[in-house]
Structures are given as C-alpha cells and as structure tokens.
C-alpha cells in the first residue's frame, strides 16, 4: 500500500461528474509535487484508448493519466466492459479481451476473476510508480442495494484501500439534497466514516445562493461540503455517448458544417474532439432516420457493432442519402468501423460485429470504397504512426493514433482509383473527387484528427471547395489543447474546492 492514503471520488449517480473531478484532482496533486495514480477498477464504456503496450482501457482513465502527467496504462482500468447490445458486453481484463457475458450472468461468473484483475492492476500500478498516491474513481452510485454484495469498484475498493472518499452530486439534475442524504443513509455503518467530504458539481449562478444549502447539509449529515464547482461542461465532452445531444450549441464563427453519424453502437467518439475544438467547424450529429442535408463533409465514426449499425443506416434510408450525397460530390470520411461500412462487402463468419440481419455471414456495405472486410476474433491493438500521402501538400505530414478493431480489410480488384491514405497502406484508403462522385476516404487510425497540421490540411481541402481562405497548418497536436483544458479545470477546482478535509482526515 502507498504511504499516503488513497483518495476516491464517488458519485450519487451516473453522470455526476466523477471522471472530470478525478482528472482535476490528479492535476491539482501533480501541481503539489505528488505522483497521482488514477485508477478505476471497473468501467463500462465503448470510448476506449490503447496504451503503449497494446492494452485496451477506458478513455476517461487515459485522460486522468494525462492530467497526472503519466502515460496511460491499462492497469489504471483493469476491468473494462464494452456494451455490445442485447444486454451483452465484451469483457476486457488488464487490457485484453477475455470473452463476453450477459448482464444476468456477469456477477455470477465474473465477479471473482474481476476482483482478481483489479488487485493485479493495483499491484502493477503501485509497483511501477512507488511513492505515488492512488486517486480512485467510483462507478455509478455506490449504494445500489441489489448490487452491493458483488460491488467491484466502489465501496469494496474503498474499504480494501481505506480510501478517503468525496461524494460528488450534480445539482444541475435537481434533487441534490435527496441525492446526498439518500446515498449517505444507504451506506452501511462500516462505510459511512469513509466519506470525508461532499462536492456539489455543475452549479449555475452566484456561489452565495448555495450558502444556506451548504449549512443544511453539514448540519444534517455531519459531513463537510468541500466546495461548489461551477458549470464547466463547455470544457470537455460528456463521457457517455447518450449525452451527445447535450453538447455545445452552434458556433457563431463556424464556416464548415460537418455531419457525424450518431450510430446506435457508437464507439470512440473522442476521435471527434479535435474537430469539435476547431472554432470554424460546426459538428452536427445525425442519427439514422434523421435528415442528412448537405453538409460540407460527413464523418462515420467507429462502431462496436459494425454490421448492426450498418443495417440501421441502410434500413432507415440514411445509407441511400449518403450514397446520393457522395454521387452529388459530397465528401465522406470513415474511421475504423465507419471505414469498413464504406466498403463493398463485410463478412462476419463468427458473429463478432452484430451479424447480418438475414443470418448470413456477409453483408453489402455502402459501396463507396472498393474494400472487403473479413472479421475475425483476433483484435488489432497497437499505437501507430505513419506519413500521410493524402491530402497532398508541399510535404508529407506525420499522423499518429491507434488501431482498435477486429477484421482485415483489403482493396478489391487492385482498384486504380483507390489509393493508400498513408505509407502504411493497410491503415486507410482514399478515392479522390471525380466525375462519378465526391471524395471518399477511410482509416483504421483512431485519433487521426489529433494531428494539428494534418487536420488543418483536411479542413483546407473542404474550405477550398467553398471558396474560403485556407487555415494555417502550423497547428500543435491536440494533446496541447487538451492539456490546457485540464489546467483550466484544475484552476477552477483549486479556486472552489477545499481539499484539506479530504487529505488530512483519518479513518479512525
């Protein structure tokens, strides 16, 4: 165990803001000269990251690692559940897939292996960072009475590590007093002393308007309110794809309108964060059945269930709209599963990607790129970098990211119109503008838009078609902007939150 007590961020519910408060806490401790070690025993998310060793982990723990000044490693998130639909999730233990499980069987079959993986992750993380302080994030609510006996990542972990816990409540949702009092009242007597402070999140308005509420909470719970965080949702996108509709509104300076397909099994939507951060770009999320319109480009992001999402696109009429859009000169760009959907054929003999609606193992794609994908149980998990051959310019630009996919994609009939997107030919392809339709491109590289010069060159291609002046390609990697946002988050945290009761209290 570490010499300094572990800290833990619990929440009264899902979406209370635990992930960002944990990231803020990591950055603040780093500023104080500590080595914070972010850790979430079990996470459920299709927004993933691949570490340097090829291990899969939740993106939110990668973000917390960057906040701590560390390289992300899968030990920070030893159990990851990736929803596949039909109450089934893929299970990732210590970075690698160990199978799938239905919700009703998960705790029966996977509780003991999960707890073992969590302990192994803790040991690995502390061994590689001696002297570090664990900063834990809980999951959902810590007092789901029907799940408490099989809890893997909340109070079981807090008790195991004797962690000092802060309880976060989202006042924006309403009912913050009931959230807090109800949660505290459902804690068992042995658990209650672990809660060292309360944190009110997403408060709008003048701070003094909550003074009376703070006095009431402290008088009626005996737990100090560490502070009140203001509304900061404009800094980072939501962790959960269900919250995408709550993202930022229209930008006054937007000059490009880019449609992004809101797939039913959307994954790795953090790929779009660098575009969201561009002041001249407006992203518009389009779900199957909604109007595509005439955007300047369409991006099809990753999917956890590629064939099911492809069927949703085709059956809703969105597929036909995409094909007509491209025939009329529109630009379409696919990432990972999105690129696979752009091809001619997708084969899923093992039913890994949702299966075809008819029960066949092969399904026709959108037919916008001459590609054939065959899915297999082997999963590509690795960080990559390569020189981009497209878009063209005065010199090739380096792009980097990671692969995270099942399946092998090959080009059909040695197409003369379809060219490699970069020097590593298997990473992506591009079919240029022609008399037969607009440009279509795709890549397996998650994070491709994080490269500032490449992103700007891609945007400038769209701007040229609209008669807009080019943007400067002298743009840093998105990681620098992300780091600046983490600093802003930590600045607000230090301004509004008193950490001393959390850091200095005892568990006696």
UniProtKB/Swiss-Prot annotation:
Pathway: Cofactor biosynthesis; adenosylcobalamin biosynthesis. Pfam families: CbiA, GATase_3. GO terms for biological process: cobalamin biosynthetic process. CDD domains: GATase1_CobQ. Residues 255-454 form the GATase cobBQ-type domain. Keywords: Cobalamin biosynthesis, Glutamine amidotransferase. Coiled coil: none annotated. Gene3D superfamilies: 3.40.50.880, P-loop containing nucleotide triphosphate hydrolases (3.40.50.300). The active site is at residues 336, 446. GO terms for molecular function: ABC-type vitamin B12 transporter activity; catalytic activity. Belongs to the CobB/CobQ family. CobQ subfamily. Catalyzes amidations at positions B, D, E, and G on adenosylcobyrinic A,C-diamide. NH(2) groups are provided by glutamine, and one molecule of ATP is hydrogenolyzed for each amidation. This is Cobyric acid synthase. It comes from Synechococcus sp. (strain CC9311). The gene is cobQ.
């Amino acid at each position: 165990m570490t010499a300094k007590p572990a800290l833990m961020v619990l929440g009264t519910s899902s979406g209370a803001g635990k992930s960002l408060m944990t990231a803020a806490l990591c950055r603040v401790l780093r500023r104080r000269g500590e080595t914070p070690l972010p850790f979430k025993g079990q996470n459920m998310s299709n927004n993933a990251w691949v570490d340097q060793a090829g291990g899969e982990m939740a993106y939110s723990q990668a973000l917390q690692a960057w906040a701590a000044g560390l390289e992300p490693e899968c030990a920070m998130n030893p159990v990851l559940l990736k929803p596949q639909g039909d109450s089934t999730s893929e299970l990732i233990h210590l970075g690698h897939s160990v199978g799938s499980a239905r919700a009703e069987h998960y705790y029966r079959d996977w509780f003991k292996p999960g707890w073992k993986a969590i302990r192994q992750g803790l040991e690995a993380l502390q061994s590689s960072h001696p002297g570090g302080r664990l900063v834990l994030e809980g999951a959902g609510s810590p007092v789901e009475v029907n799940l408490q006996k099989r809890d893997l990542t909340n109070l079981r972990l807090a008790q195991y590590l004797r962690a000092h816990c802060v309880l976060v409540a989202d006042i924006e949702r309403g009912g913050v007093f009931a959230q807090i009092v109800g949660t505290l009242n459902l804690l068992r007597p042995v658990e209650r002393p672990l809660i060292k402070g309360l944190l009110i999140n997403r408060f709008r308005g003048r701070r003094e308007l909550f003074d009376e509420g703070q006095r009431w909470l402290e008088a009626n719970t005996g737990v100090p309110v560490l502070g009140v965080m203001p509304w900061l949702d404009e800094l980072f996108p939501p962790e959960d794809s269900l919250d995408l509709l709550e993202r930022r509104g229209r930008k006054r300076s937007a000059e490009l309108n880019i449609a992004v397909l809101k797939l039913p099994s959307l994954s790795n939507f953090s790929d779009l964060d660098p575009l969201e951060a561009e002041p001249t770009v407006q992203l518009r999320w389009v779900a199957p059945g909604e109007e595509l319109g005439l955007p300047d480009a369409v991006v099809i992001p990753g999917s956890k269930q590629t064939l099911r999402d492809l069927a949703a696109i085709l059956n809703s009429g969105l597929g036909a709209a995409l094909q007509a859009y491209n025939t009329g000169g529109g630009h379409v760009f696919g990432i990972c599963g999105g690129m696979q959907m752009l091809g001619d054929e997708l084969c899923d003999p093992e039913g890994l990607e949702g299966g075809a609606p008819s029960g066949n193992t092969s399904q026709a794609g959108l037919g916008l790129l001459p590609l054939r994908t065959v899915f297999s149980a082997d999963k590509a998990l690795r960080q990559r970098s390569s020189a981009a051959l497209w878009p063209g310019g005065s010199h090739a630009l380096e792009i980097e990211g990671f692969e995270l996919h099942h399946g092998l994609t090959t080009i059909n009939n040695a197409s003369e119109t379809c060219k490699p997107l970069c020097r590593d030919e298997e990473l992506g392809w591009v079919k240029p503008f022609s008399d037969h339709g607009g440009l279509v491109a795709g890549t397996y590289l998650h994070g491709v838009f994080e490269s500032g010069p490449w992103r700007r060159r891609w945007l400038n291609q769209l701007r040229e078609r609209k008669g807009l002046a080019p943007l400067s390609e002298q743009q840093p990697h998105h990681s620098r902007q992300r780091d600046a946002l983490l600093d802003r988050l930590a600045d607000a945290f230090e301004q509004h939150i008193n950490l001393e009761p959390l850091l200095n209290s005892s568990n006696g």
